[in-house]
Amino acid sequence: MTPTPDAPAAADAATGAGWLARRRGALARVALAPIAQAIGRVERVADGIAFVSGLEDTMLNEVLRFEGGVTGFAHTLDEDLISVVLLDPDAGVRAQTAVARTGAVLEVPAGPQLLGRVVDPLGRPLDGGAPLDAAHTLPIERAAPAIIERDLVSEPLDTGVLIVDALFTIGRGQRELIIGDRATGKTSLAIDAIVNQRHSDVICVYVAIGQRASAVRRVIDAVRRYGAPERCVFVVAPAACAPGLQWIAPFAGFSIAEYFRDRGQHALVVVDDLTKHAATHRELALLTREPPGREAYPGDIFYVHARLLERAAKLSAALGGGSLSALPIAETDAGNLAAYIPTNLISITDGQIVLDSALFAANQRPAVDVGLSVSRVGGKAQHPALRAASGRLRLDYAQFLELEAFTRFGGLTDARLRAQITRGERIRALITQPRFRALRTLDEVVLLKALAAGTLDAMSPDLVAPLRERLPAWLDARIAALTPALAPPRDWLADDAALDALAESVGELIERIAADAARRATAGMPAEDAAGDIGGAFGGEQARGDADRDADHGANREVSREVSPEASREVSREVSREVSHEADRDAAADAARVAGRAPGRAEPDRAVPRAMPDGPPRAQADGDRASASRPPPDARGDAARTAPSPQGGADANVNADANVDAEAEARHKR
């Protein structure tokens, strides 16, 4: 049954009064003012820069849309022209092309949907996945936290690299610069830090600026293989993309990381690298006719990098206590740290890790220069147990480097100095660490305690690599044996007595490794197989092939380091004694050579020595025997040079002369 309308409604429907009132209300809500949109025109375009006129009210960094769909952002604002940096290929952008404002600044999508994805600086997928949900976006240019909003950096950001965690600790919220020449392992060190966060609560953002596509692919594959890609975001602006995308890439990466920091989480940003970003900024500045300064960089290059890196901070507890750490990478030219961009970045950041090309060539990885590297947070963010265990590590290693330089003048007979050199060789073997072989904080503390106790002094440096590989499983087994059943979790790093016991047990592990290595050597098996078998016996881990495993622990490098005056004087006395002994032996050798020749006899031609009946030339044979088994320095003398020869007096003279030449060549090499 259809309901009957009431009387007033029926009357309105009959007269049309209600309809007229509704129409009048709708008309009152209509905006009758004209809607005008400013349209600009392209005056000229070249090299990814468009100069636009007619848009005087444009904001800095505002997104402009060209006819045909190409976008760009306002880079510089002049009275007559606006310099617009294109974010897409400039195909279709010509003179007199229409340009419209959007009223929005550059933004990038942010949120958990980015985790595990590879995107460009605008958030567009590069991995072939689905487009990202742009429900939550952040501007790429954001103000750095104020001083009152920050907290002290007091928590460590573990990298798993012993030399970094022990000597140059990085804290959560710190900015630590990684700087060095080309191909010295800068990216490798940063990727090791990312990979080590696979068991932590840190979100990692890797920003590639101007890198080769193949190099970026290797980085992504390494993180996917060894790390936790589901906790990483890759922002890629390769060398082939537009300069505008390369310029905004680090800002976009920081905005993505700030999303997690502002929600009480911890984030790490690796910018690879800021040297290429500075070159891109210089390119854009020169194209937009900005006045150049030092090394042709514009005057605001310091401000650009400062406002970027100041966004890394540890927030106060009132704001959630989140942190944003930064590992910017910079490249030097021939180790010149005094160049413009390196000095700027060193002054902006909270420390630097300097990688040396000579150490890298000597196969020391990571090639960290201990004398030039520093962390301005350091022990404030270091774990107390690790800080106590690494107290004298840097001083001992610096003194070893100077003593090692002295040993080139001759051997040292002082037992204390030899022990110090032995300790330094073990330190160098410990800090030489292959890629993707991260150590836990417990492993680092136990290794350093064993080093300080002298447990590692008696072992060969070649056994340090298998010791480092097998130590985690060894410690886990010891901890399991010391932990009662159903016992609550225990903080082993807070128990000094337990740490000392674990460090003492390292000696037993060293004995087993040495015995197994000796057995393998007797059987003629290569060292790599021995290390792999040791891993199977003690750690249950698979031996992983890596070229960095065979690091040369005996590489020498002269470095000027600070050493105590007493040690310097003692080393000088030792060197003087060795030099005087060498001079005495040289004089005796010359006298013996003169006495061994007949007066007036012409010196035989050493270029064509007399050949033995059934073998190589006698001089070569004697030289080989002398180099194969050379007597000690005190036993060398006239007897070694005047040994009887079955060939007679002439052959004796030839043999003596050959031995003297071998002696002189050996001394020259020393």
Swiss-Prot record:
F-type ATPases have 2 components, CF(1) - the catalytic core - and CF(0) - the membrane proton channel. CF(1) has five subunits: alpha(3), beta(3), gamma(1), delta(1), epsilon(1). CF(0) has three main subunits: a(1), b(2) and c(9-12). The alpha and beta chains form an alternating ring which encloses part of the gamma chain. CF(1) is attached to CF(0) by a central stalk formed by the gamma and epsilon chains, while a peripheral stalk is formed by the delta and b chains. GO terms for cellular component: plasma membrane; proton-transporting ATP synthase complex. It catalyses: ATP + H2O + 4 H(+)(in) = ADP + phosphate + 5 H(+)(out). It comes from the Bacteria. It is found in: Cell inner membrane. InterPro entries: ATP_synth_asu-like_sf, ATP_synth_asu_C, ATP_synth_asu_C_sf, ATP_synth_F1_a_nt-bd_dom, ATP_synth_F1_asu, ATPase_a/bsu_AS, ATPase_F1/V1/A1_a/bsu_N, ATPase_F1/V1/A1_a/bsu_N_sf. Residues 525-670 are annotated as: Disordered. It is an enzyme of class 7 (translocase). Keywords: ATP synthesis, ATP-binding, Cell inner membrane, Cell membrane, CF(1), Hydrogen ion transport, Ion transport, Membrane, Nucleotide-binding, Translocase, Transport. PROSITE patterns: ATPASE_ALPHA_BETA. Produces ATP from ADP in the presence of a proton gradient across the membrane. The alpha chain is a regulatory subunit. This is ATP synthase subunit alpha 2. The lineage of its organism: Bacteria, Pseudomonadati, Pseudomonadota, Betaproteobacteria, Burkholderiales. The record marks 373 as: Required for activity. Residues 589-599, 650-661 have a biased composition (Low complexity). Gene3D superfamilies: 2.40.30.20, ATP synthase alpha/beta chain, C-terminal domain, P-loop containing nucleotide triphosphate hydrolases. The keyword Cell membrane applies. Its EC number is 7.1.2.2. Transmembrane segments: none annotated.
